[in-house]
């Protein structure tokens, strides 16, 4: 939750980022944040589920207001978003992101371009690899992450199939961009991606082996909070 500030208007996309409200609710912090989906709901708690739980993407419990989708996108286009939490399919070394086409499947970007273009902070959330990866949380002391098997497909690539978010343009606009995965967190810089956090019990080689391009390592590289790897609510 360090990436969110009380009072933020936060858009949520599908995928891992859709779990943000559940974490906020677990910690009892939902009051200060205003969650938004492009379907029109603003405020309250989005009724977004997960692959194993029933959800209704676009619906909100106790919304402050419900707008037309056109009005929501006008708000986004005007720079009203503080934070956008989005998924990703492929990431290039300059921070550019593809969500529209991969492995021969053309999905299209949907509202992704509109949402990410002017959000002050963009959080791309997803796994480092795709295709039946297997990781286990180690809840004992010290807590951490055990990587059993990487997915068949790398997602951080030298070349991506489409550019739906342009990294260099984001830097020029002054956007803050983070790429948050299960084992590593990267920050976008003018020189490309910089590794700033790594999961406990994971070494840098386990990150480098899953990424095609070279990235820099922050001199202030730190471990992710061990509490994130325990099956218990994290105290705010």
Predicted regions, residues:
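Conserved phosphate- and dinucleotide-binding cores of soluble alpha/beta proteins
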Residues: 49-234
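N-terminal active-site beta-alpha-beta segment that forms phosphate/nucleotide-binding
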Residues: 1-62
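Short alpha-helix boundary/capping motifs
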Residues: 28, 234-236
């Amino acid at each position: 939750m360090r990436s969110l500030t009380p009072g933020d208007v936060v858009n949520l996309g599908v995928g891992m980022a859709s779990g943000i409200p559940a974490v906020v609710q677990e910690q009892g912090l939902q009051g200060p944040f205003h969650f938004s989906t492009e379907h029109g709901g603003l405020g309250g708690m989005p009724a977004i589920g997960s692959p194993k739980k029933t959800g209704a993407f676009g619906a909100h419990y106790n919304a402050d207001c419900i707008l037309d989708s056109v009005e929501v996108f006008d708000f986004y286009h005007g720079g009203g978003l503080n934070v956008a939490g989005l998924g990703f399919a492929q990431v290039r070394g300059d921070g550019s992101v593809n969500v529209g086409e991969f492995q021969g499947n053309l999905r299209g970007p949907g509202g992704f371009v509109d949402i990410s273009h002017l959000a002050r902070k963009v959080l791309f959330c997803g796994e480092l690899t795709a295709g039946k990866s297997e990781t286990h949380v180690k809840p004992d002391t010290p807590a951490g992450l055990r990587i059993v098997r990487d997915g068949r497909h790398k997602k951080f690539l030298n070349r991506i199939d489409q550019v739906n978010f342009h990294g260099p343009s984001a830097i020029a606009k002054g956007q803050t961009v983070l790429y948050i995965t299960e084992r590593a967190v990267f920050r976008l810089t003018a020189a490309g991606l910089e590794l700033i956090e790594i999961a406990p019990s994971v070494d840098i080689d386990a990150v480098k082996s899953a990424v095609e391009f070279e990235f820099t390592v922050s001199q202030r590289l730190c471990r992710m909070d061990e509490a994130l790897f325990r099956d218990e609510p994290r105290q705010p």
